[in-house]
Design a protein with these regions (language model features):
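Conserved beta-strand-loop-alpha-helix hinge in the C-terminal portion
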Residues: 238-270, 538-564
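Conserved ABC transporter NBD signature motif
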Residues: 77-89, 383-390, 400
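Conserved ABC ATPase signature
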Residues: 157-161, 165, 458-462
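The feature captures the beta-strand-to-loop junction immediately N-terminal to the Walker
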Residues: 54-56, 360-362
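Conserved ABC ATPase "signature" region
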Residues: 135-153, 436-454
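ABC ATPase C-loop
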Residues: 174-175, 475-476
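H-loop/switch region of ABC-family ATPase nucleotide-binding domains
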Residues: 218-219, 518-519
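Helix-to-loop junction immediately C-terminal to a conserved catalytic motif
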Residues: 69, 375
Length: 592
């Protein structure tokens, strides 16, 4: 008979570090809501560990993130049951100011945390409030701004930065706090590839030290996958569905994740499609490099469906309407300045009607500015832009709304009403549409975007994904012949993003011209007919999606090919696959 040594148990207890974060049976109910999201969630995060929170849109990921630094329940009206402990401090019993010394936060919307007039002041603001001496404050501010590549712009106003630039600034503010716990909500959503690499390199250096813990809400799994140690998955009700090591969760539980509609690495999605065609990849690859290696190990592969050729069908399989003779958009010698900074420089581009154009470029390249100028959101010099025979610089708001449906990068920038239903109804009412028709359109849009239960909710109280769906609904409801969308899939889970893109594909197939600004180059490869590449405010390339992806234009503009294109471009044994860029070009049924 063997007697357990009590010292062994004590040693095991001492071997495990005290959790940096402990969440125990946490449920959160927002003011005015009947249900809780998240619901009865329990997990720990150890020092030196990176934990990824996954789950469908609206399941409570961002709410849970806000609870980790005490904003829920101290600042956000919500009822929290259970306990959240950070570095030994019960968040319910501490002030947000005190907790900020232990946990730093990067919000889903970086604009919501900007409070000063220069980048240097913004990053110094947090350390100053810790009553640190001036030299330490300035040292932290400089180090953090250099880490995100913004030190040379330290004297600029945050408002002059691009969306991605403001996101990097928010990350610098969090780094300057030197808190042992870092919580990041979609930190790379608006960043170009170089910015993403910089951010994840900084995060890697933090966790390699062993003292920092990171909780990450992120849809770009292709960027995050190599940093993350463990994945926690919430279901649609906000309950904990799965948790475990990264590969164990993503590869071994992939069928459950597919049913939940969460984001997955592109390499894994490709492997699932190939598995359905009888091509066994074991273990399932999670990165482009792993996918390349797995395919190189195959003795033979069937020919890809399209092999990267230019085709005239959208992702839904519907034939595109042939472009009309008259262009949808003509931009001529367009220069635009913001303050003393030139943003657009000599832009000349003509976009055919019925095109689906992705506008891409690094942060600060001028993508959002060009899109806003085309939509008339910002005024360009008269005579420089023609949109379906209309000069946006001269058109009134009602005429513009009939012609161009616009979606802002930040959904909150376009909300002006106090309920979801009223927000949707505003555009049709502005057009003088009869009340019964307005109500019919609103009801249809609420159903289309699964917002029926939220029709009387204030738009600002929606989750990030719900806000995005509402903003897209307001752009679609007037039936404008041209849609201009800035990062339309931001904040959406995979299922919702797929629904939205299928909707845009369908409208495009019927003749609607679609312009999309995005950093998601796999989305570009799958859905766009053309790519417009901007570099430092100039047109670097414009052509069909296949031709631009086959060229060096993206690399030369400081971008990176989509994950699938990167994986297949490196193949040596299967050259017919090197030009594949889209998931739908892969075989998906049994091969003979």
């Amino acid at each position: 008979m063997t007697v357990a040594d009590p010292h062994d148990a004590a040693s095991a207890a001492h071997a495990r570090p005290t959790p940096a974060v402990r969440v125990q049976s946490v449920s959160i109910r927002h003011e005015g809501r009947d249900t809780t999201t998240p619901t009865e969630v329990t997990f720990d995060v150890d020092p030196g560990e990176v934990v990824l929170l996954l789950g469908p849109s609206g399941c409570g990921k961002s709410t849970l993130a806000l609870a980790l630094n005490g904003l829920v329940p101290h600042a956000v009206p919500a009822e929290l049951t259970g306990t959240v402990t950070v570095s030994g401090m019960r968040t319910a019993h501490e002030t947000v100011a005190r907790l900020s010394e232990r946990v730093a936060m990067v919000f889903q919307d970086p604009d919501s945390q900007m409070v000063t007039g220069t980048l240097l002041d913004e990053v110094a603001f947090g350390p100053e409030n810790l009553l640190l001496d001036r030299a330490e404050v300035l040292s932290r501010a400089e180090e953090s701004l250099r880490q995100v590549g913004l030190w040379e712009r330290r004297g600029d106003n945050p408002d002059t930065l691009s969306g991605g630039g403001r996101q990097r600034l928010a990350i610098a503010c969090a780094l300057a706090m030197k808190a042992p716990v870092l919580v990041l909500d979609e930190p790379t959503a608006n960043l170009d590839p170089a910015g993403i690499d910089e951010v994840y390199a900084v995060l890697r250096s933090l966790v390699d030290g062993g003292d920092h813990a990171i909780v990450l809400v992120e849809h770009n799994l292709d960027a995050a996958i190599e940093l993350v140690d463990r994945v926690i998955v919430l279901d649609r009700t906000g309950r904990l569905a799965i948790q475990g090591p990264t590969r164990e969760v993503l590869a071994d539980r992939v069928d459950e994740l597919m049913r939940l509609g969460v984001w997955l690495p592109v390499a894994l999605l490709a492997a699932l499609r190939l598995r359905a065609a009888g091509i066994r990849l074991d273990p399932l690859p999670l990165t482009p490099h792993e996918l390349t290696a797995a395919l190189e190990a195959q003795d033979a592969l069937p020919a890809p469906a399209v092999a990267g050729a230019v085709d005239e069908t959208v992702a839904t399989g519907v034939a595109r309407t042939p472009p009309a003779a008259e262009p949808a958009v003509r931009v001529t010698a367009l220069d635009l300045d913001r303050g003393r900074t030139r943003i657009l420089n000599g832009i000349d581009v003509t976009i055919d009607r019925g095109s689906f154009v992705a506008i891409v470029g690094t942060n600060g390249a001028g993508k959002t500015t060009l899109l806003q100028a085309i939509a008339g959101v910002i005024r360009a010099p008269a005579g420089r832009i023609d949109v379906l025979g209309l000069d946006p610089a001269k058109a009134d708001a009602r005429t513009l709304a009939r012609t161009v449906g616009f979606v802002f990068q930040n959904p909150e920038h376009q909300f002006i009403k106090s309920t979801v239903a009223e927000e949707l109804a505003h555009g049709p009412r502005l057009q003088g549409i009869p009340a019964d028709e307005v109500e019919a359109r609103v009801s249809a849009m609420l159903e289309r975007f699964d917002l029926q239960e939220l029709r009387d909710e204030h738009p600002f109280l929606l989750s990030g994904g719900q806000k995005r769906r509402l903003s897209v609904g307001t752009a679609l409801i007037d039936g404008a012949p041209l849609l201009a969308l800035d990062e339309p899939t931001f904040g959406q889970d995979r299922a919702r993003a797929s629904e939205l893109l299928t909707l845009l594909d369908g409208l495009n197939a019927q003749g609607t011209t679609v312009l999309v600004v995005t950093h998601d180059l796999q989305l570009v490869a799958e859905h766009s007919s053309h790519i417009l590449v901007l570099d430092s405010g100039r047109v670097a390339a414009f052509g069909t999606t296949a031709s631009v992806l086959a060229s060096d234009a993206l690399d030369e503009a400081g971008l990176r090919r989509p994950p699938l294109a990167r994986a297949f471009r490196e193949l040596e044994r299967h050259p017919s696959w090197r030009s594949v860029t889209r998931l739908r070009d892969l075989p998906s049924g049994p091969t003979s």
